């Protein structure tokens, strides 16, 4: 049983509380989202939240004391020896014949947006692709497709080895993404990421919808590019939405700017939705591997077979070995914002983070840059950094990223990035950032009711409703 509790609102020192029959008087002010002790702690005694240790007491603490990063220390150290202890997953979730309005592509895949993307092979042409996107927007007055977007980046040259290969993989995944109704790939000509080699690297693609321009090989790159874009626009603008079963939806699960409510409201909501989507035959993807440390065995024991278990061990230990090889401790993850919001250790963050994927079996484990092959719950190799992780989720083929936040963030990647607030204060203060408020879950709306509303909203977004 948990031996700390979380304050839903700011609680003053001297407040008398009854928690699960335990009478408590608070010894100090407890900010909303933060923990207080339900018992007296001896130095070194484990602090339990979500039913698992989140660290140990650095010093003796009294019942009613504020428990935070100053008095809780992580239990995480180096590499661990893991044992496969599979559990039986039994989820009684009814199948519903739900559909959304998506775009059926020539290869049979489905997109939830119909956008024209301009993707550079190298950062040297960033200015050109921006001019082209703006030019097409002016000509079309923003009509006919969902968006016309240039995707500048700083890579594609002065890169070798894995760095270069990873750049190629992510750019390939973008070019092939079904949310793009048409793509213009713009190269320079002398870069490491050679356009003709990159073209071969794509594998099969729709040559009517993916075009290339090498700027060193044309006279006026703006006029040449606009001519190609007009042709792509003429084709993409004829695409229409059609009914698509929910089983074809793929979502990425992400959190950033987490707080003490993340593991109580928004992340469990995503977990409930993920289980529902998987029960309908759909797909969800969890990443942020370093933020699994401390909760990884929960995922390992839900792997469908021992091969997936071994792949998950490799996924976890690869990141741990990377940190250790650079002299970095594996447990120093929580940011200043996390701590201010009530998260004290990486274990606490991880136990909240992994709730986003519900209770379903793990059916796939993916390296960085790989595209989705299996339905169900997939684990994807990427760091906790919001920009990298969200982009990797989108590159894997996710139609949208479901992003929970307690502190707030405006970031979005190249697919619809829905922000779900963990608390109502954030939703009220940042309506331009937040798309869905999960804070109502601690305001007496049952999780099941919130999830029903969330499912309806996801279907609307998949069918074309824009997010902030």
Regions found by a protein language model. Name each.
Residues 1-400, 407-468:
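Metallocofactor- and cofactor-centric catalytic cores in central/energy metabolism, strongly enriched
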